[in-house]
Amino acid sequence: MAVISKVTYSLYDQKEINATDIIISHIKNDDDIGTVKDGRLGAMDGALCKTCGKTELECFGHWGKVSIYKTHIVKPEFISEIIRLLNHICIHCGLLRSREPYSDDINLKELSVHALRRLKDKILSKKKSCWNSECMQPYQKITFSKKKVCFVNKLDDINVPNSLIYQKLISIHEKFWPLLEIHQYPANLFYTDYFPIPPLIIRPAISFWIDSIPKETNELTYLLGMIVKNCNLNADEQVIQKAVIEYDDIKIISNNTTSINLSYITSGKNNMIRSYIVARRKDQTARSVIGPSTSITVNEVGMPTYIRNTLTEKIFVNAFTVDKVKQLLASNQVKFYFNKRLNQLTRIRQGKFIKNKIHLLPGDWVEVAVQEYTSIIFGRQPSLHRYNVIASSIRATEGDTIKISPGIANSQNADFDGDEEWMILEQNPKAVVEQSILMYPTTLLKHDIHGAPVYGSIQDEIVAAYSLFRIQDLCLDEVLNILGKYGREFDPKGKCKFSGKDIYTYLIGEKINYPGLLKDGEIIANDVDSNFVVAMRHLSLAGLLSDHKSNVEGINFIIKSSYVFKRYLSIYGFGVTFKDLRPNSTFTNKLEAINVEKIELIKEAYAKYLKDVRDGKIVPLSKALEADYLESMLSNLTNLNIREIEEHMRQTLIDDPDNNLLKMAKAGYKVNPTELMYILGTYGQQRIDGEPAETRVLGRVLPYYLPDSKDPEGRGYILNSLTKGLTGSQYYFSMLVARSQSTDIVCETSRTGTLARKIIKKMEDMVVDGYGQVVIGNTLIKYAANYTKILGSVCKPVDLIYPDESMTWYLEISALWNKIKQGFVYSQKQKLAKKTLAPFNFLVFVKPTTEDNAIKVKDLYDMIHNVIDDVREKYFFTVSNIDFMEYIFLTHLNPSRIRITKETAITIFEKFYEKLNYTLGGGTPIGIISAQVLSEKFTQQALSSFHTTEKSGAVKQKLGFNEFNNLTNLSKNKTEIITLVSDDISKLQSVKINFEFVCLGELNPDITLRKETDRYVVDIIVNRLYIKRAEITELVVEYMIERFISFSVIVKEWGMETFIEDEDNIRFTIYLNFVEPEELNLSKFMMVLPGAANKGKISKFKIPISDYTGYNDFNQTKKLNKMTVELMNLKELGSFDLENVNVYPGVWNTYDIFGIEAARGYLCEAMLNTYGEGFDYLYQPCDLLASLLCASYEPESVNKFKFGAASTLKRATFGDNKALLNAALHKKSEPINDNSSCHFFSKVPNIGTGYYKYFIDLGLLMRMERKLSDKISSQKIKEIEETEDF
């Protein structure tokens, strides 16, 4: 099949519809001939096509037609286009509406775009009547009536026949088409002689069962039958038009219907493009429950017998395979034989006669049951990233379940509690070769962004790794027994006694070094914990090995170590019993006694406070502050439990060093003090969305407690531990949380999946070009992919070493730091980066040496400097800043830290060039990789408990999925959270006083009303402590009351006095007369007074000012004050003195003030912050997404393709069902370059692996060279001028 490079969309014209000779004229008929189910319309359900004689797979269907007897039927989706054109012509004479007469000798094709636009404004008039002297009729507005199902004159609702509209539109001369934006013959908007009947292939039957009898129906076939029926009856135009609209898109005439029609099956989640083209059901697939197997390696997958006997693989007949095929036929192993000459597939069964069908010529193939070691793709859904779908070698295993190695369970998010996986056996030999390289676990070992291995030990293996390292005094036989099948090459080197460390050295098998961890392949750390053996850890031994050599060595270590750990467990055993957790009841009894005592003290103190408030001895705290104090007391109780448990663990380790539970804790597998607290101490406060359960009827959650009870246990504090067991009420509270969490998980899975799909659609066409830049089509997004132009899985986070006077080259390092430090002090100066990105893991090549053998200090500096200068020019074209790389090499290879030989230095920089040259290739789909990593992480996060940054009633800057969703949707006209930071608290206080919402009711006033002879008197007594607590003054309270009364329309006359009652209280007395009806208005006034007398912006949030330590540099901190406030616009801050106050606005305010580049920076950091701590490695994908959203002049939402030239097919697969209609209407022509279009037309997309194909635009290189030479020459001239001036 030829490669399609361009596609043009247009509407079928009537000649094409008339050209088919399959006439449909019956509603029902024997054998369905002449009906809408006619066998000539294509092959269906195993029957051959009666037109071309081909099968379902080969026949694309044939169109039929039904006569509509010269009736003019409008194509329903283009009704709005016809109305648009009618608004530009006179319905009476057919001439264009114009302000003045126009001549027909204008050549519109010669006009420029601007001239054409001016002419449009001039001609397309808004006048009331026609300029044509022979017509002079008033212009009529034509609309489409849903009720009558035809065009009508809006003025008098009289029908306008379709034939009249047809005549007027086709009479518009072709030369005026550009003026009206007509792209093809207007007759194509109508059906005239015949209506087309689509092939059977686009209307597959929907099966359902009634009384266990299968029925088949198809809504489209029924609707087409109705059109044929009406045409046969020669029905009125409106009747046929209605039938056509019901078939095409019923929503045009009826809003509240969900019946299936053409529009329905081409839009929404289950549209035909997504269901049948982008992805569809396949054969040669299997699905089963998964289980673990200890006998298979990471690169293998165990397949049960019944799947192996069902799936078949092809063997093509050629000179190399013909003998093997004959053997298979002779041994009766062939299931199918395909004869290419006869185009015939034969099923081979016992006793079946197959004479003269088998020729075994090149091109034929046989299908046999799938064999061991064949590559098969398998995966677990949901497939959140590419490690969920991999291709491994098949191994025969017993039982009925698919078996996987436990080492890959983490990467597939699989556990063995009934999870299922699917598998597909690809038939095309090219596909098999491709998958066996690109999807092989060895290829995928390291995470695309994080750089750590995605495979590693799980569960018991982690404990085995810890215990094995600590074992001592092993004889050779014991070592060989532990090593099992890998022990044959073990060299004792004359030793009689061995330790676990020796076994690790043998397993590592390379002379590898890593600071503080490895020396010449020997582990120098104190213990081997989970960080060394599990997946997604930078200290993983498998990762360090693959950084040092290749992924093959990394995978080999995982396979060998996993085998050895399992053997260790089977020999020495490991088990945890309840006795390990709780040898006796002494400790739990002690903890319980402490908890009961403390909770009683808390209750007592709280009850005393409530009594004193009731008796008027003290002024109550605000509700938020009261809840905070209670929460902090309960938190102290929780912390006390954790401290007691930590001490207990420490003591147990001294008394019983072989306690298996504590071994697990030390190994970093399960059981931390918090988990132990739930089991042994107290189950703690139950929260829903981060808050204790809300009180309901009678001021309580459950009827176990008294009405309006303030008991902490009545709000979900569970005192019992799980060992003791929960009481009824405690169980209800724990289930209350479980209910809300399970609801959240169901809803969040759907929401995160939707956003993930949008982000992937948005980013899928973002690839790396031949120069290591990130592009979409011809648009440059980033100068340097991954900042290093090296594959993301090769880059490595390393410690950021700050300048120190003890360092060699201190001045140079310090100068570099001053240039780059802004990037490492972030999040409003609250955080200082601890890690930075190294271009590759060069630390595994750093081998310490003595002072005598070390490279000279100056030589090393010159080498680093020369390499960076060379890389800057040759690889980054001096366009990108790579100072961070120079800083890393200068600090990590600093002679004050470590001395290395010249050979080591040369090795490091040779490896550096190797990574630059060979890892990141043209076509690397960096967009999809980044989108998947972001999506996978926010999905995980949305399903775990959410967290926020602020407490105490302030506006919460939410972390997690919700905030990420808001940032990517980029909704306008919403309030934004503005942060103000200053070292001068008074500047923030003036903003706070003006903006913070305080109403009279919050000050707990004592309001009394009395009536005097000619007026009402209202006394408001307020305790001054409340005024102070609200951080306002008595004058502000007076102003609040005064302002409310003066603006009140129900007050006729008023006066006000302020009195100081005593040292604690102040009284505001108001004298009032109301407008009629006086009683009613008095009631209204008294009802709204506590809330309506207020100041500030109405908001449920307070505006507290908090202080924090801000970083100016790694060694310079400053006390700063911070305040967050919700504002619509920064103009509201215009009247304040904000000199030396840092204002951090939201994304739209940032864009409005500082422009698109600042908005990009803001979006990147804001998206990264939603992930919380420990996700710094997501900076690169966040930056890439932010750069894409801000690639044009204005930030663009992930929901839209407003700026990018997104293809019609991309829009259609994204869910825009109007995309194809608009493309056809405007006769669009588009190249097939993007992912969606390539998928649709079976073209290989221009994305690759970075292994084989480079796309280099030589023109770009020449332009770049010219620019660089111009830049260098102008620099030289400047230098000469400066020298002359000197």
From Swiss-Prot:
<dbReference type="Pfam" id="PF04997">
    <property type="entry name" value="RNA_pol_Rpb1_1"/>
</dbReference>
<comment type="function">
    <text>Part of the DNA-dependent RNA polymerase which catalyzes the transcription of viral DNA into RNA using the four ribonucleoside triphosphates as substrates. Responsible for the transcription of early, intermediate and late genes. DNA-dependent RNA polymerase associates with the early transcription factor (ETF), itself composed of OPG118 and OPG133, thereby allowing the early genes transcription. Late transcription, and probably also intermediate transcription, require newly synthesized RNA polymerase.</text>
</comment>
<dbReference type="InterPro" id="IPR007066">
    <property type="entry name" value="RNA_pol_Rpb1_3"/>
</dbReference>
<keyword id="KW-0548">Nucleotidyltransferase</keyword>
<dbReference type="Pfam" id="PF04998">
    <property type="entry name" value="RNA_pol_Rpb1_5"/>
</dbReference>
<dbReference type="GO" id="GO:0003677">
    <property type="term" value="F:DNA binding"/>
</dbReference>
<comment type="subunit">
    <text>The DNA-dependent RNA polymerase used for intermediate and late genes expression consists of eight subunits Rpo30/OPG66, Rpo7/OPG90, Rpo22/OPG103, Rpo147/OPG105, Rpo18/OPG119, Rpo19/OPG131, Rpo132/OPG151 and Rpo35/OPG156. The same holoenzyme, with the addition of the transcription-specificity factor OPG109, is used for early gene expression.</text>
</comment>
<dbReference type="Pfam" id="PF05000">
    <property type="entry name" value="RNA_pol_Rpb1_4"/>
</dbReference>
<dbReference type="GO" id="GO:0000428">
    <property type="term" value="C:DNA-directed RNA polymerase complex"/>
</dbReference>
<keyword id="KW-0808">Transferase</keyword>
<protein>
    <recommendedName>
        <fullName>DNA-directed RNA polymerase 147 kDa polypeptide</fullName>
        <ecNumber>2.7.7.6</ecNumber>
    </recommendedName>
</protein>
<dbReference type="InterPro" id="IPR007083">
    <property type="entry name" value="RNA_pol_Rpb1_4"/>
</dbReference>
<keyword id="KW-0804">Transcription</keyword>
<dbReference type="InterPro" id="IPR006592">
    <property type="entry name" value="RNA_pol_N"/>
</dbReference>
<keyword id="KW-0946">Virion</keyword>
<dbReference type="GO" id="GO:0003899">
    <property type="term" value="F:DNA-directed RNA polymerase activity"/>
</dbReference>
<dbReference type="Pfam" id="PF00623">
    <property type="entry name" value="RNA_pol_Rpb1_2"/>
</dbReference>
<keyword id="KW-0240">DNA-directed RNA polymerase</keyword>
<dbReference type="InterPro" id="IPR007081">
    <property type="entry name" value="RNA_pol_Rpb1_5"/>
</dbReference>
<dbReference type="GO" id="GO:0006351">
    <property type="term" value="P:DNA-templated transcription"/>
</dbReference>
<dbReference type="InterPro" id="IPR044893">
    <property type="entry name" value="RNA_pol_Rpb1_clamp_domain"/>
</dbReference>
<dbReference type="GO" id="GO:0044423">
    <property type="term" value="C:virion component"/>
</dbReference>
<dbReference type="InterPro" id="IPR038120">
    <property type="entry name" value="Rpb1_funnel_sf"/>
</dbReference>
<dbReference type="InterPro" id="IPR007080">
    <property type="entry name" value="RNA_pol_Rpb1_1"/>
</dbReference>
<dbReference type="InterPro" id="IPR045867">
    <property type="entry name" value="DNA-dir_RpoC_beta_prime"/>
</dbReference>
<comment type="similarity">
    <text>Belongs to the poxviridae DNA-directed RNA polymerase 147 kDa subunit family.</text>
</comment>
<dbReference type="Pfam" id="PF04983">
    <property type="entry name" value="RNA_pol_Rpb1_3"/>
</dbReference>
<dbReference type="InterPro" id="IPR000722">
    <property type="entry name" value="RNA_pol_asu"/>
</dbReference>
